[in-house]
């Protein structure tokens, strides 16, 4: 695997010098300063590429070229936004950057309720609490019909939880959910958020798939033409939330994508921390079935709690993800490619890390502190080395 590291650009508290010392050779970044939907010019791409290369690294993967909400709702200026996206892909290819991660999550990108969940060892993790989320949705956001998405027990627990929350607790929970986590391109006020949800009131899973198909049929031929590999990131968490459909959550969704546009440019980001939240997702089977189309991997683990829809981010080698079997399946896919004469390694980044040691005293991007990811990268690197030596060192 190619060892990579997500970097949020010049404002990231983790420097490129830090990234290099962590042992990564590739950088995963994006032009976050360019508004959603606008074309990334060759000039801006080359500027960022030069910064990365001057630090002795390579820009391996774009994460992400964000998709304008008009495309997802198939409204407004969606045709122009699609044309802009096509041009951005052409410009990236011209600059030699050929792997693009993206997602098709409506309104919200990845979502957590607690950004400072304290683990028994004193380090901090990200957590999604189903009851807190229900309390937000029913009692703070007051989304009409939200009760239909919860069990009677969850509704009662959410009311109880809400009753014990201080104003600061409510403000923090709201901020955590709607203000935009790292990599999310949109942050909202509560009123803006309600308005955005309203845009989806007539969009169910079938309709969102229809809109996604329009995007794929416009984008994938361009990607194929210029040699770019698109790698869709799964929904996080991988299930409908806030009454919004989610359409990249299961192996069935992956198969739908391939059936919709059967091109090798139409590929996947294997994010074990997103897919792995669902007990019915067999990660190794996903890798084996869709291995040739996996162009990027995010390796992390989560731990489901008593309510199976509640989870926290576990250490990379713990939790519900069998990291050994996952890495073995990825390495096997790389060797299969090698036997076909393809030398490309699959870029891997240690996804999220616990906030620990002196990062606890620093301002960090939630999930993206340096030391927790350094630990995760070192652990995954060790697993890969052992697998390579044990199975492939002839």
From Swiss-Prot:
Domain of life: Bacteria
Catalytic activity: D-mannonate = 2-dehydro-3-deoxy-D-gluconate + H2O
Cross-referenced InterPro entries: Man_deHydtase, Xyl_isomerase-like_sf
GO biological process, one term: D-glucuronate catabolic process
Keyword NAD attached: no
Statement: the UniProt record of this protein carries the keyword Cytoplasm: no
Enzyme class label: lyase
Entry's Gene Ontology molecular function annotations: ferrous iron binding; manganese ion binding; mannonate dehydratase activity
EC number: 4.2.1.8
Keyword annotations of the record: Iron, Lyase, Manganese
Pathway: Carbohydrate metabolism; pentose and glucuronate interconversion
Essential cofactor(s): Fe(2+); Mn(2+)
Known function: Catalyzes the dehydration of D-mannonate.
Family to which this protein belongs: Belongs to the mannonate dehydratase family.
Protein name listed in UniProt: Mannonate dehydratase
Organism: Escherichia coli O157:H7 (strain EC4115 / EHEC)
